[in-house]
């Protein structure tokens, strides 16, 4: 989000709600944890594969995620601060796996699916079976749809570059017509997506057209 200093140069914001997508990830993880417990499963330790902690979106995301899982059996035991992208997700997860020897990693939260995809690779190389030993939840849908379809990733949140672009154009048109925006902050939708809903997930764009998930996500979808 624009800070107070930047607002003198920016007439409005169009984009994702970091809090909402992290909250939705937390709710999905709660759902997965409840199902595991009901089936007699044990172990609810969570590894967070995060954005760099100096990045503004990190604080918004981790706090919303913690609020969403509060009161559940889930406990964060590690928070990776390696960087963006698959390579950093892999590197950070590998380091944390070594650092957490003796503790089980039962759930993984990825602040975006690119980071999570790298983390999943590191977990698998360490001998863990995704979807069985470890349950993974991500956000942003910039990873690989196949991970969800194969059950290696429980879910993600749908963040659509198409919606961000359409909303930005809509706000520019509004500003040119009226000289101001009705709302300075304008968020795009970030609904949850799981294996059960992935085939039927669709969103209506700001142009009124209906788009499927393969048109909306930016990863290997």
Task: Give the ranges of each region predicted by the language model.
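Structural recognition of the beta-strand scaffold that forms the well-ordered cores
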Residues: 1, 11-12, 45-49, 78-79, ...
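Flexible loop/hinge segments that line or gate small-molecule binding clefts
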Residues: 1-20, 39-45, 141-154
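Solvent-exposed loop/turn segments at secondary-structure junctions
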Residues: 1-5, 19, 52-56, 82-87, ...
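Extracytoplasmic ligand-binding site segments that recognize negatively charged/polar headgroups
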Residues: 15-25, 44-69, 75, 81-87
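Stable alpha-helical elements in mature extracytoplasmic
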Residues: 18-21, 25, 29, 57-61, ...
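Short, hydrophobic alpha-helical segments
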Residues: 29-37, 97, 168, 172-180
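Hinge/cleft segment of the Venus flytrap/periplasmic-binding protein
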Residues: 43-53, 69, 160-221
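Hydrophobic alpha-helical
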Residues: 64-65, 77-78, 82-147
